[in-house]
A protein has these predicted regions:
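Short acidic, low-complexity intrinsically disordered linear motifs used
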Residues: 314-321
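Short polybasic/polar patches that bind polyanions
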Residues: 149, 170, 285
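Short, aromatic/basic amphipathic alpha-helical patches
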Residues: 48-54, 235-236, 279-288
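Structural signature of tandem-repeat unit edges
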Residues: 1, 7-21, 30-44, 54-114, ...
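BRCT (BRCA1 C-terminal) phosphopeptide-binding modules in DNA damage response/checkpoint, repair
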Residues: 280-283, 287-307
């Protein structure tokens, strides 16, 4: 489908039956659409057709509807639509998820095996559930590149071995991460600047180079079973994003670097928890990062991740249940 010529102000859009393929950017301009009815004859769909609309609604919410675009299709041999989301006919591949998530949890079908490229880009919470969680069903075997590009997730859990392509969570805002896959691959979390708590469970055997970027990460717990790459946290930048908690000094408003901090400042924000003489302990010593010995006990680990060892806890610490 070439660039659409539909009424850009319509909320409900019906794609003509002559359309067989919906390609990248082909639905640009439908900024006010809330429902798109796809033709039963459709053979190919890419979420990149409407990804830019999700970005605009996420970043310029005062101009556009505060709702998702829901996709609908009936009597199709190739696709199934459920609650606005689009899957392949057999439900095994998620192709598109409406970006305003209701109920606080990303509703991925228990039949899904593949979370497709770009399928969950720019997802975030819909009022009143602004803080959303992503827990993948055991059926999920693969998360494709850019699947969660630009997503805003309070807590992400990856508790089984899943094939994750590079940049799967690129540019996402993820406050808390619990991960238990055998190998955490490099560049999966490229440019994620809003991590605060990360928990590597006992199932994690290795964390590869540049798996994470230094910045707003506050507490990382690493299991004694885990071997970390010498560069598993990317420290290649000279400046890093500074975390804010809803306050800003007026004295800083004219300072172009008010939202940034140096490498040394960023390292001071980070605490690694684990067992003495572990790979994590050695990494912390080598990189001059604060290390706290934490017993391999669920309650002790959770206390550490919530910042009880610090002089002042962050206000939202209790809101990220590990």
């Amino acid at each position: 489908m070439e660039k659409q010529t539909l009424n850009k102000l319509d909320k409900k859009i019906t794609i003509p039956k002559v359309v067989k393929r919906i390609l990248e950017n082909s639905l640009l301009g439908l900024d006010f659409a809330t429902d798109i009815i796809l033709p039963s004859t459709l053979e190919y769909f890419t979420p990149y057709a409407i990804m830019e609309i999700g970005r605009k609604r996420d970043n310029e919410s005062d101009k556009y509807p505060k709702t998702s675009i829901n996709l609908h299709i009936e009597n199709s041999d190739n696709f199934t639509a459920i609650n606005g989301a689009l899957y392949t006919k057999d439900m095994k591949t998620l192709l598109y998820m409406p970006n305003k998530i209701k109920g606080g949890i990303v509703p991925i079908s228990n039949e899904t095996e593949i979370i497709g490229e770009g399928s969950c880009s720019y997802i975030n919470g819909a009022y009143p559930d602004f803080a959303i969680k992503a827990n993948f069903p055991k059926s999920v075997k693969k998360i494709c590149k850019n699947a969660f590009f630009g997503a805003d997730i309070c807590l992400l859990k990856i508790l089984s071995d899943v094939e994750i392509e590079k940049t799967a969570f690129a540019n996402s805002k993820i406050n808390g991460l619990v991960i238990n896959m055998e190998t955490v691959p490099s560049e999966v979390f490229t440019d994620c600047e809003e991590f605060y708590r990360i928990k590597f469970c006992e199932g994690v055997k290795r964390i590869e180079k540049n798996a994470f970027k230094l910045g707003t990460i506050t507490n990382i717990y690493i299991s004694p079973n885990t071997e970390v790459d010498s560069d598993f946290i990317d420290m290649s930048d000279k400046m890093y994003i500074k975390k804010h908690f809803g306050t800003c000094s007026f004295d800083d408003l004219d300072n172009p670097d008010r939202n940034k901090m140096t490498l040394e400042e960023a390292k001071k924000e980070l605490t690694i928890g684990g067992e003495k003489n572990s790979s994590a302990h050695n990494y912390a010593i080598k990189n001059d990062i604060r290390f706290i010995e934490v017993e391999n006990d669920i309650d002790k680990i959770d206390e550490f991740l919530k910042g009880y060892h610090q002089e002042s806890k962050f206000e939202f610490a209790e809101e990220i249940p590990f």
